[in-house]
């Protein structure tokens, strides 16, 4: 089956260039032929159910037959192509991830390396056009930086998106940026910065110095343990609500507010003055500041059991009292 697929790919390439002289374009003509052959052979292997290992360390498998991911973009009646790319890299001094279209999800684990899974999806008017777009998308990993590059589109009938799921050590310094997509951080302790324009933010069981914002999206924050370990948390949104889940018997200095919206507190606290749009108080024995605010949206504060486990924010060599 694989031999037949590769043979078919060779025929496709030869037919495509058969009307031109073999020496057309000189060396570049031969390079174009070889690149086309490799691309068709790679996708023939993928359609045959095989994962492809690339020379730069990525492993690629086809996911075009699976359900389309509607997380960050819509498909309409367009055709799509999909592949999952994975790579494992050494733990960097700082993890720097940036993307135009797609979410970034980083999970802290008991490990010493960083495993990256990128689900790359492209859409166009035809399946072949979508597959061509996939082949143009590059993901670069160098010195802890993970950046993607692809073609620019000005019309909605063509495009692509990349959703990252990254498994990293719990002790981590990271900066995450995306334009169109959500950001999720779980079970991490360190200097963590995040920024998205169009997407929600989920923060679960974190510690250290955590700062970031979204323009269009909500904030969902779940604290763990009995206090914040580290400098504190500062998270902001312009258009979106805030949900803050605080464990019983938690100690921190809490600040939250909204311009156009209300504040709902589902547990007893002691405050001075009106809390209609702004709240600042110590809970428990006080401590580092937990700051979360929105311009347009409501704020809900709830009590619940700690979300922590082995990775809760009360531990870690980089934490501060």
Annotate the PLM regions.
Residues 113-120, 252-254:
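A compact, surface-exposed functional segment
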Residues 2-113, 121-126, 130, 154-161, ...:
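Short acidic/polar N-terminal linker immediately downstream of export determinants
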Residues 67-69, 73-94, 103-105, 130-195, ...:
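Right-handed parallel beta-helix
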Residues 45-48, 180, 184, 191, ...:
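Asp/Glu-rich intrinsically disordered low-complexity tracts
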Residues 88, 210-214, 218-321:
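Short, surface-exposed interaction patches in beta-rich subdomains
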Residues 109-111, 142, 227-228, 249:
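Short strand-connecting beta-turns/loops that link adjacent beta-strands
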